[in-house]
């Protein structure tokens, strides 16, 4: 069974969807995804990782594997609780719990930004903010996630998916 959760973040965090079966998730609307505020990227990542590791420690059966997809149109600029080194350490620790993180960044060098926090370039994707490239990026996420679940391989974006996410 695949469960889906969705957290929005800027200078604060808002959990929009928690543990809904993937087939029951309704499509998001464009207004759901409008950027606003500043970007407390590291705090959002750190709080999310902390939540899921805590849940796993309380109940070892709560998930077999977990994929966390980070999508941002801004660079880190307002986190107070976490920094790049603490996030990098947390992401390394995630491997003990079969937690994978994937980074999608608009209007930035997503591969460079992901590397700062320990996410491999295979799991990072640049995308342009057009309807076509955003749709392409999320289709790539779906395909990559399916490949991982099907054959047990590490998550990675294919070269063709990288090309399709750019104008």
Model-derived features: positions:
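Acidic, low-complexity intrinsically disordered regions
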Residues: 1-167
């Amino acid at each position: 069974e695949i469960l889906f959760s969705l957290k929005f973040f800027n200078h604060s965090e808002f959990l929009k969807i928690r543990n809904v079966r993937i087939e029951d998730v309704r499509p998001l609307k464009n207004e759901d995804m409008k950027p606003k505020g500043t970007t407390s990227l590291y705090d959002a990542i750190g709080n999310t990782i902390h939540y899921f590791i805590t849940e796993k420690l309380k109940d070892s059966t709560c998930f077999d594997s977990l994929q966390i997809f980070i999508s941002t149109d801004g660079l880190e600029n307002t986190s107070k609780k976490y920094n790049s080194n603490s996030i990098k350490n947390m992401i390394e620790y995630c491997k003990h719990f079969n937690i994978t993180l994937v980074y999608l960044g608009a209007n930035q060098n997503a591969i460079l930004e992901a590397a700062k926090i320990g996410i491999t370039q295979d799991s990072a994707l640049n995308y342009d903010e057009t309807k076509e490239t955003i749709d392409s990026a999320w289709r790539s996420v779906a395909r990559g996630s399916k490949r991982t679940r099907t054959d047990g391989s590490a998550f990675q974006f294919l070269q063709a998916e990288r090309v399709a996410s750019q104008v």
